């Protein structure tokens, strides 16, 4: 073998590692694409799971969205017999309803027991037909149809149950203050008769600014 053949053979031997490194790079590209696809699927899953009126989420305290404030309504359910129901539409103060076209982004409901509370209640916010009289039969049907996600609040010896709040996102619906009368807070007293002095419900409605506070309450 002459020198030219020897040099050619040497060059061929030197190319093999480069072919190997290109193969490793190709493998890394494939892994990166797989990882990117997995992240994309995860993002879609998370986006689909963000809270809506039908899929609420537990919250603590959150800052209002920029340009938004909130109005609070306090509800004290009257005595509710064991296995019975209570419903109350969301009627905001006149000072707020005069701005009926202001958008509503979220509704937060907070359940706070009074000292005598030692039972279990189911609580939800639900859009109800204008024709509904919120009778026991009507509310019972709403709880039974499976379309009403609920906060199950149980007696906690230490005081307030850790998860005592639900946040409903109304942004996709473009709901406004004028629409709030179409929504109601519903309560089901599951195990015992609920006395009128046992429970307080705070409903915080986050809407476009009619300036007051900037933080949803704890």
Curated annotation (Swiss-Prot):
Where does it mainly reside?
virion
Record key words, sorted:
Acetylation, Capsid protein, Ribonucleoprotein, RNA-binding, T=3 icosahedral capsid protein, Viral nucleoprotein, Virion
The terms describing its cellular component in GO are: ribonucleoprotein complex; T=3 icosahedral viral capsid; viral nucleocapsid
Q: Please tell me whether the keyword Ribonucleoprotein is annotated for this protein.
A: yes
What Gene Ontology molecular-function terms does this entry list? RNA binding; structural molecule activity
Residues recorded as bearing N-acetylmethionine in the entry: 1
For region Disordered, the annotated ranges are 1-28
Subcellular locations according to the entry: Virion
Amino acid composition bias (Low complexity), ranges on this chain: 1-10
- A Pfam family assignment: Cucumo_coat
- UniProt biased composition (Basic residues): 11-21
* Described function: Capsid protein. Probably binds RNA and plays a role in packaging.
According to the UniProt entry, the note on domains is: The N-terminal arginine-rich stretch does not seem to be the major RNA-binding region that allows formation of an infectious ribonucleoprotein complex.
Family that this chain belongs to: Belongs to the cucumovirus capsid protein family.
Q: What is this protein called?
A: Capsid protein
What species is this protein from?
Cucumber mosaic virus (strain M48) (CMV)
Top-level taxonomy: Viruses, Riboviria, Orthornavirae, Kitrinoviricota, Alsuviricetes
